[in-house]
């Protein structure tokens, strides 16, 4: 490639190759730093009470910008339902503990709103409080409906609801898996030249394993 780029001139090709290696090394260094920042941002959001899936999705939509990801999470509370191991529909059916309801009431929130928020956010006081503060002490309309649905008896059987949602759930899981794997693949146009067949096999195996693990977790629940 170096000789081709330099019309067969060996000396120029050697300089060209050395320069390209320096450029690629710099690009790889920047990509490592980018991945490190992304992991730090994910951990920062997890420390605020968000699940890893919610943090990753928000950061993906915000192109890695932490402040924008926080805005996305605040304005799209449905993302907070994303759980790392189980479908959110099962988790939202749990009744909140009285102790955590009392904590929110002590902060000044209405008991009914506190209970509804805790039901939606699986007893997570921090997320429930953030939602209530952001919406003037109440749940937004879409979350109010979700809280009511989770506390009432469904009119359809579990098998019926599972049948109608399984296809879209599988598609969402596969899309998320693809996005996760793609974010770990170097972005530079010539990086594939440094990849071996073993590297490609590892990436494919990781993708297939990721999809299989998510599907297995969904089936268990």
Swiss-Prot record:
Cellular compartment(s): Nucleus
Highest rank taxon of the organism: Eukaryota
Residues spanning the signal sequence: none
Domain UBA: 1-19, 30-76, 95-135
PROSITE patterns hit by this protein: UBA
Keywords tagged on the record: Nucleus, Repeat
Ranges of Low complexity composition bias in the record: 146-168
Comp. bias (Acidic residues): 169-193
Xref: InterPro entries: NUB1 (IPR039749), UBA (IPR015940), UBA-like_sf (IPR009060)
Pfam families attached to this UniProt entry: UBA (PF00627)
Cellular component GO terms held in the UniProt record: nucleus
GO biological processes: positive regulation of proteasomal ubiquitin-dependent protein catabolic process; protein ubiquitination; ubiquitin-dependent protein catabolic process
Chain residue ranges for the region called Disordered: 136-193
Function: Specific down-regulator of the NEDD8 conjugation system. Recruits NEDD8 and its conjugates to the proteasome for degradation.
Binding partners and assembly: Directly interacts with NEDD8 and PSMD4/S5a, a member of the regulatory subunit of the 26S proteasome. Interacts with AIPL1.
UniProt protein name: NEDD8 ultimate buster 1
Gene designation per UniProt: NUB1
